[in-house]
UniProtKB/Swiss-Prot annotation:
CDD domains: RF3, RF3_III. GO terms for biological process: regulation of translational termination. One of its GO terms (cellular component) is cytosol. This is Peptide chain release factor 3. GTP binds at residues 19-26, 87-91, 141-144. The keyword Transmembrane does not apply. Its main location: cytoplasm. Increases the formation of ribosomal termination complexes and stimulates activities of RF-1 and RF-2. It binds guanine nucleotides and has strong preference for UGA stop codons. It may interact directly with the ribosome. The stimulation of RF-1 and RF-2 is significantly reduced by GTP and GDP, but not by GMP. Residues 10-277 form the tr-type G domain. GO terms for molecular function: GTP binding; GTPase activity; translation release factor activity, codon nonspecific; translation release factor activity, codon specific.
Amino acid sequence: MDKELAEKVKKRRTFAIISHPDAGKTTITEQMLLFGGVIRKAGTVKARKTGNFATSDWMEIEKKRGISVTSSVMQFEYKGKRINILDTPGHQDFSEDTYRTLMAVDAAVMVIDSAKGIEPQTKKLFKVVKKRGIPIFTFMNKLDRDGRPPLDLIAELEDLLGIEGVAMDWPIGSGQTLKGLYDVANNRVELYRKDGEDRFLPLNEDGTLPDSEPLSQDPQFQDTLDEIELVKEAGNKFDPEKIALGDQTPVFFGSALTNFGVETFLNSFVDLAPAPESHTVNGDEELSPEDPEFSGFVFKIQANMNPHHRDRIAFVRVGSGEFKRGLDVTLARTGKPIRLNNATEFMSSERVQVSDAVAGDIVGLYDTGNFQIGDSIYSGKRKIVYPPLPEFTPELFMRVTAKNVMKQKSFHKGMNQLVQEGAIQLYRNYQTDEYILGAVGQLQFEVFQFRMKNEYNSEVEMNSIGHRVARWIDPEQLDPRMSNSRNLLVKDRYGNPLFLFENEFAERFFHDKYPDVKLTEKL
């Protein structure tokens, strides 16, 4: 085993941040980048008039709306570790992109608004992360506002998500009366609104503050000591094994907006979070991240990260070996050899050429149309295929045409590139070949329309055909006469036939009429 490679892998920390919209995910990402020395000041998403947009919200529509709709990747060095943050869309319509991103990380950070507690989108994303069995770290955000009692927030983790919460620090007051954090793990108090080393007060051996400190006489500090005592006696005990399996989550408190508690969280996170681990490939083989053969999988494709060049980037999570510029790889799906001359690392839309990357790193490959989401690539003689990424059956459908028939070329180009990103799905009417788009949520259509106009100068006309139940059919069983006004026959972008049923009743009617025909939810 290559010792140097093993050392590099050990330094990697690759994670995603999950939350409900507006819980402060982008703000905490910005503060981490600040500590990593990547940016000089954190851009606040809300301040749209100032033109200070968040670093991770790089696409035009995100800047206008203040929501993340694509996952972006940010990389930086911190305390001898290489940090790879994958920022994920908080908006529910973009769950496909988010779910795929969660397949490319080794840990997750869950950001919760301390006034609202666990919200629906957090719950959904938590389930995906839990299923993967990777560690989950929790940051209870917005302590600078009046919120719910910390004991309630910890209890809710267990009640709603079924995961044990173990407090790493504890608020002293909240909102207007916030004084600081009682840092259990580091045996100190972190004062609110203080800079530099002045903000830390060491605790006595018995966990109290020296009498000379004014805070020691504050009734709120006494309340905190009582709560800490209660948590120590009745709460969960810190258990590294449970954390590794995703059965226990270390809980940190703070305010990302005022940069309070974030550094303490980040320091603990890089110590506790895992380095890249083995992947299951080829069905049942374990592939070590330190395996000398390079391999990785495409979890995202993004068009127009640089609108001036109309490029496409395939995001690859490295699973094993070491990537070097000019590396020859094989695309597992086609067996096609590809030389990887141009690869890039990210700071949102800023890019630098990659000279080398190891397991845990995310590299962007310039794509001329070779790659699809879920593709595996490998450098050796042994074929390596990673498990398929989750796919979703759309529920909303729209007919789409170009407003200007003279601009068919840009219409088709934009359509194909955006469909290959996997943010929207394309179907064609079996008889007429007209385009039909499918999506998980309405916002995807709006983003599609906006990007077609903004990035491809192609205005589109969209007409809803509403909610539909999509079911694929074996081509050998298909008779086009099975189609009628209640079950539209279309083909997906790979040419596979499927029906879009008006509702579940129409699907049941079809089953009754053709009992021997097998329909499937997803190919």
